[in-house]
Amino acid sequence: MRRNSCTVVVLAGSAPGEVLAAVGRSMNVALIRPEEPADSGGDSIEAAAGALQRAGRATSPYALVPVDPLAAVAASWRAMWDVAQPQGPAEFEQEAAKALAAWRAGRFELPDYYLVLARSTDAADAGDHGPDFYLGPLRSSRPHRVAVVAATEPAEQAVGVLQALGSLRHGPWWPALDEVIETARSFYPDSLAESSAARVVGPPASS
């Protein structure tokens, strides 16, 4: 667990460039991009880990990181539950093993919070691509540490991200990554509809 004044938040999934640009203009937020693009063919875990390390040294109140060392784990978990093209657990286990090895070696630790852009305030319908690792097993591990911004337009998403950063809830730190992975192994997507513990933040109401 880090002990510094900056709150490190991973923005999970793909965020529009307009959202990142708008959030990056905030005086309270440092936008920490990876030094090497995640899709450049390099080590995605290493790129995300480096960004998280730099975020941990930021002096602003919040550091927003648009890459995640668990991104491949999240993608393979979602693919495992794709009823149209079922792939089984092999890829998930492979990516989980890579992430666990990097975590155990001290290459990264989980951020203070995860922030997820979603289309709905309904937890069962928040993911855009079916079962979602962040809204499912990760959130069930520590509900206070996964926040959701429910908006579809980039301008609303940017406002929602800034609003969410200012209303993050305190709570217990993450369990060991081994426990998170084990939760993912036994988590069934149908239980998404049964959980409403996430912090859901939508755009402000029009006046």
What are these regions (language model features)?
Residues 8-14:
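A structural/positional concept
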Residues 1-8:
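Extreme N-terminal, non-catalytic leader segments
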Residues 14-61:
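Conserved substrate/cofactor phosphate-moiety recognition/catalytic segment
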Residues 2, 15, 120-207:
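NTP-dependent small-molecule kinase module
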Residues 52-56, 62-138:
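ATP-dependent NMP and nucleoside kinases share a basic, alpha-helical "lid"
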Residues 9, 32, 112-117, 146-150:
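Hydrophobic/aromatic beta-strand patches that form the interior of the parallel beta-sheet core
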Residues 19-22, 74-78, 160-161:
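A short acidic (Asp/Glu
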Residues 27, 110, 141-142:
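Short, structured coil segments at secondary-structure junctions
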